[in-house]
Amino acid sequence: MRVYMKRNRLSLPIAAFVAMAASGSALAANSTNLDVNFTATILETTCNMKLVGGQGSDTVQTLTIGNANGEVRLDDVRNNAATANFQIVIVECPASLSSLKTTVTGTPSGYLLTGITNSLAKGTGVSDYSAVTIARQTASTTPFVINSTADAERLVWTETEISNKSVPLVASLQETKASSLTVGRFEATAVFEFEYD
């Protein structure tokens, strides 16, 4: 499974300021003075995050489920034993950080909304009816819904996780339809999108 991180950046729209400035110039021709006071709150909106537990860089990693060769027994998948642990770690965030929400994005399985489907084209040697789920290690049976921005369905960091600057996660290979899982290669990509307050 390849894991990416994506940072959301906020930008201040300047079109409103341009429109206000243009209307102010037009009014000046009529000898009318307008005083405009702008009030703004400037926030530091980005954090630096990294992944720990797989192979690769801090922001793009490959996580192997199974043995060193990525081999997993069919029974292990069906018994929820085909897993790999990893973490998202805060490297640097503003001291004012009070809320951190993470959406797990990818191509969801049509049978399992919490699973990211196999990205390999169906065919000989490719696993079918398989997906990978991502959950907290402390709540491994409650995976996040893929692409959901609803707080109840995505990773909302607790105060303790923010304070510890880390959230331990588990990726689990799952069967998406009972008695349908086929053996073969499996690859999936998850992207983590962050919202900060």
Task: Place the predicted regions along the sequence by residue.
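Generic structural signal for beta-strand residues in well-ordered domains
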Residues: 19-21
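Mature extracellular/passenger domains of Gram-negative fimbrial/pilin and adhesin proteins
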Residues: 2-10, 27-197
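N-terminal signal peptide c-region/cleavage motif recognized by signal peptidases
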Residues: 23-25
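Sec-dependent N-terminal signal peptides
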Residues: 11-17
